[in-house]
């Protein structure tokens, strides 16, 4: 019997990316359970947040179109918290692998710090599991620059079903055997161009770009409020990075790991006096 795979995301249980991913993984013969936030949780990183009613976290059974045989749950919690709940067998047998996505929008470069999609896999890796974060590059920097982040999300809502989710789902399934041969605690971050699979030039291992696709600026501020805007990053693409690979029509794969001690930093702590000198 194959190992159980948890599929989650940060866009919410009702978005198409998670349905496409669940269908593809199920068809590949894997044991799958889906648990994802009830509502949008983008930018939640690895936060441990939940909405409780009388001390209880709400969990609702859901049915995924095209994957009705997959047990699925909408959960009033962040993606990372959902992973934690799954590890405690809240949704049946604990998973051995966590897939997160398919995110609507690339999680490339510095953006991985804020991503709830990646945050879920970081939580899994910290617990000794392997994880795969999957994102589809559906929002170009130009699109992200035309309005605020909220308006950009509204635009995505209108065009969700027209995206090439199948391309990302298929590549994710093909990466699972590769992931299985990595050390425990490994995360693979997959970013896929929004193209038919025949239009994708291939897979490239890539480093993280020093910046994300878009940057937030202050569009307006006054008494009691600020208004932000999303702008295309003004940096030049560096060869060998994930953003450069996407721009050239490649899907990028970047191995990540959960936070750990930086042994290269030397600290002189002996010179610091902790106790207050006696007067």
Per-segment meaning from a language model:
Residues 24, 120-125:
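Hydrophobic/aromatic ligand-binding patch that stacks against planar heteroaromatic rings
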Residues 11-16, 223-224:
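Short acidic, Gly/Ser-rich segments with clustered Asp/Glu that frequently serve as metal-coordination loops
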Residues 149-279:
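Electrostatically charged, flexible surface regions
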């Amino acid at each position: 019997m194959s190992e159980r795979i948890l599929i989650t995301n940060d866009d919410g249980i009702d978005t198409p990316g998670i349905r496409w991913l669940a269908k593809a993984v199920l068809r590949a013969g894997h044991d799958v359970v889906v648990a994802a936030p009830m509502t949008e949780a983008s930018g939640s990183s690895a936060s441990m947040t939940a909405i409780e009613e009388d001390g209880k976290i709400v969990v609702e059974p859901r049915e995924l179109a095209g994957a009705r045989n997959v047990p699925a749950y909408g959960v009033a919690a962040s993606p990372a918290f959902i992973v934690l709940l799954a590890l405690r067998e809240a949704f049946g047998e604990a998973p051995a692998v966590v897939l997160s996505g398919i995110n609507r929008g690339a999680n490339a470069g510095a953006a991985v710090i804020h991503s709830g999609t990646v945050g879920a896999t970081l939580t899994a890796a910290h617990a000794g599991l392997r994880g795969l974060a999957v994102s589809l590059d559906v929002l170009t920097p130009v699109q992200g620059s035309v309005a605020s982040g909220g308006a950009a999300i509204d635009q995505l809502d209108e065009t969700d079903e027209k995206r090439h989710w199948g391309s990302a789902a298929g590549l994710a399934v093909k990466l699972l055997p590769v992931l299985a041969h990595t050390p425990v605690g490994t995360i693979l971050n997959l970013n896929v161009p929004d193209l038919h699979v025949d239009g994708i030039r291939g897979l490239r291992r890539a480093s993280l770009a020093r910046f994300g696709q878009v940057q937030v600026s202050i569009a307006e501020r006054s008494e009691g409020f600020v208004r932000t805007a999303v702008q295309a990053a003004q940096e030049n693409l560096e060869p060998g990075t994930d953003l450069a690979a996407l721009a050239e029509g490649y899907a990028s794969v970047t191995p990540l790991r959960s936070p750990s001690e930086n042994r290269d930093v030397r600290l002189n702590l002996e010179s610091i006096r902790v106790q207050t000198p006696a007067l």
